[in-house]
């Protein structure tokens, strides 16, 4: 990467957009919570003492970011895993960070999670900017950071979710792999696998980077290839814990059934998504409550699910189109990471 005039201003614009997006989303959450409330989740049943949400104005500001997965991650950080409640579907690194970093925040794990997610998001944006800038100009790098900061789903980057941590670790893995720092890349991939099950897929871009740097020659394989095994090691560590604690090394996979999820080939998953989207369109056009995979709790929620399925299909098709576009223009290592 050769410095060019305007690099500094482009970087400042990128990070101003990243910071501004966090403040904007925080403000939207605050206004929404103040206007319509937060609902009535069983906070007192799940959040332990000193980890409870805030009250009043502070509650409107911070509590929206601890819902859904956040509640489970906080519960695990305090009470640990159980065999039959589906908690083992959540991998352990984020709850461990909550538990031990929480000491710095007086044990308030909601605030701890917000701090962890925002810090990881900031680090990820720095890495993303540098990654893009190595191959393109500063304007493209700044635009990339701006787009990912303002995409609607970027709200999860500051919630008590694993998205920011996983993005940071996966980017670090890929950047180090591109530079040939295989031990660091393997360590980052191991930690990513301890964050989310999809981390194990980082072995693909790592392997592509490895052999791309060796002109695709198997004969040039050296001792550094061993570091690729650090990727599945994270999964093996998690399975070992589950085996010792519950006698079920694959409990994390069985727990997916609690969330109505299962493993399937990509073609099967896409086929199911298309069927759900078609049924969703039929529901919205006909006004009828139709059931495909499981009944919804109340008729009105069927139409919300239909809208969700259609939006998900639209984003899937957009992503597929971008992947095809990238396949024709990006190096194999870059494309494999984006895949």
Regions found by a protein language model. Give the residues of each.
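Transmembrane-helix motifs of polytopic, lipid-linked glycan transferases
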Residues: 100-103, 112-135, 318-323
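Short hydrophobic/aromatic helix or loop-helix immediately within or flanking a transmembrane segment
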Residues: 64-107
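Short acidic/glycine- and proline-prone juxtamembrane loop motifs at membrane-interface regions
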Residues: 159-165
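Membrane-lumen/periplasm interface segments of specific transmembrane helices
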Residues: 24-44, 65, 203-321, 334-338
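Specific aromatic-rich, kink-prone transmembrane helix
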Residues: 127-130, 147-150, 165-184, 203-206
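Transmembrane-helix signature of polytopic, membrane-embedded enzymes
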Residues: 108-112, 128-150
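Membrane-interface transmembrane helices that cradle and orient dolichyl/undecaprenyl
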Residues: 136-138, 173-184, 211-216
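Transmembrane-embedded, aromatic-rich helix segments that form part
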Residues: 167-168, 184-212
């Amino acid at each position: 990467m050769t410095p060019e005039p305007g690099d500094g201003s482009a970087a400042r614009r990128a990070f101003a957009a990243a910071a501004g997006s966090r403040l904007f989303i925080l403000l939207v959450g605050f206004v929404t919570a103040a206007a319509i409330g937060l609902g009535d989740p069983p906070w007192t049943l799940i959040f332990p003492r000193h980890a409870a949400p805030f009250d009043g104005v502070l509650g409107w500001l911070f509590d929206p970011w601890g819902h859904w997965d956040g509640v489970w991650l906080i519960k695990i950080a305090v009470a640990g895993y159980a065999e039959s409640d589906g908690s083992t579907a959540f991998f352990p690194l984020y709850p461990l960070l909550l538990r031990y970093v929480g000491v710095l925040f007086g044990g308030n794990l909601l605030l701890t999670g917000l701090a962890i997610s925002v810090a990881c998001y900031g680090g990820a944006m720095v890495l993303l900017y540098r990654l893009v800038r190595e191959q393109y100009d500063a304007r493209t790098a700044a635009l990339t950071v701006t787009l990912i900061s303002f995409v609607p789903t970027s709200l999860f980057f500051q919630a008590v979710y694993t998205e920011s941590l996983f993005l940071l670790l996966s980017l670090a893995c890929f950047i180090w792999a591109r530079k040939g720092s295989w031990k660091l890349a393997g360590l980052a991939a191991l930690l990513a696998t301890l964050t989310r099950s999809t981390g194990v897929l980082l072995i693909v871009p790592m392997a592509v980077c490895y052999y791309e740097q060796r002109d695709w020659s198997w004969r040039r394989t050296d001792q550094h290839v061993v570091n690729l095994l650090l990727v599945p090691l994270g999964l093996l560590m998690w399975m070992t814990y589950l085996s010792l604690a519950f006698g079920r090394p694959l409990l994390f996979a069985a727990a997916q059934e609690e969330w109505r999820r299962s493993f399937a080939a990509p073609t099967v998953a896409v086929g199911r998504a298309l069927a759900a989207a078609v049924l969703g369109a039929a529901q919205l056009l006909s006004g009828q409550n139709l059931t495909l995979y499981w009944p919804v709790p109340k008729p009105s929620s069927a139409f919300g699910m239909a809208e969700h399925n259609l939006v998900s299909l639209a984003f899937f098709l957009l992503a597929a189109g971008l992947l095809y576009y990238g396949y024709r223009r990006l190096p194999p290592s870059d494309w494999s990471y984006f895949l």
